[in-house]
Amino acid sequence: VLVAGGGAAGMFAAFSAAQNGARVLLMDKNVVGRGGATIMAQMTCASALGEEEPDGPDQHLIDTLEAGRGLCNENLSSLLCENSPKRIRQLEEWKVQWARQDNGKIRQVMAPGHSRKRCVYVDFLKTGAAISAALRNKISRDGAIQRLSNVTLTDLVTHEGDIIGATGFDISTATPVTIEASAVILCLGGMTKMFRRTTAPNNIAGEGL
């Protein structure tokens, strides 16, 4: 399995594929695990854990769709709201140190767009860095995952309607690269580079579109 994009989504996809028996090549145009938007995120992650006050995925979805003002994909939003609590717990098991209340429960705070104290964080504005570090640790210890840095994807290779790999090039040498794969997972982020000002890295350019 080829996973294109070595940010949080790509690292988790690579880990999941390896856990299901696949041999994985995880590639990124930067250093795998050091690029993307997640590592730069400082503040909070929304998850209906209900640690501070009653909450649940259904209310989280209502808030998400209302804040999205018609721009959200409802199916994807529902999937996000339903799965976020288990992912927060999983990251906790992977040593992400969420901020705590005095009673030991995970601290949750209000954030714009939410009707509940729902958002979790790591102290000292290190939420994204802590998540990325935990994921890097998981993939670095998995022998089924090979990492390939400084390679950017340019196209998918197809045969009779099936995707059989991808093409790209090594950024440092401009050498063309062709990768054969039985499956390709695109985790290439958005296209915030189209804006003059953005809080995301300036190389998130929408290559996966």
Positions of PLM-derived features:
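N-terminal Rossmann-like FAD-binding beta1-loop-alpha1 element of flavoenzymes
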Residues: 1-26
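Hydrophobic/aromatic ligand-binding patch that stacks against planar heteroaromatic rings
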Residues: 12, 16, 36-37, 184
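Conserved N-terminal/central alpha/beta ligand/cofactor-binding core
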Residues: 29-172, 187, 193
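Core beta-strand elements of the Rossmann-like FAD/NAD(P) dinucleotide-binding domain
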Residues: 173-183
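Glycine-rich loop(s) and the adjacent beta-strand/alpha-helix scaffold that form part
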Residues: 183-209
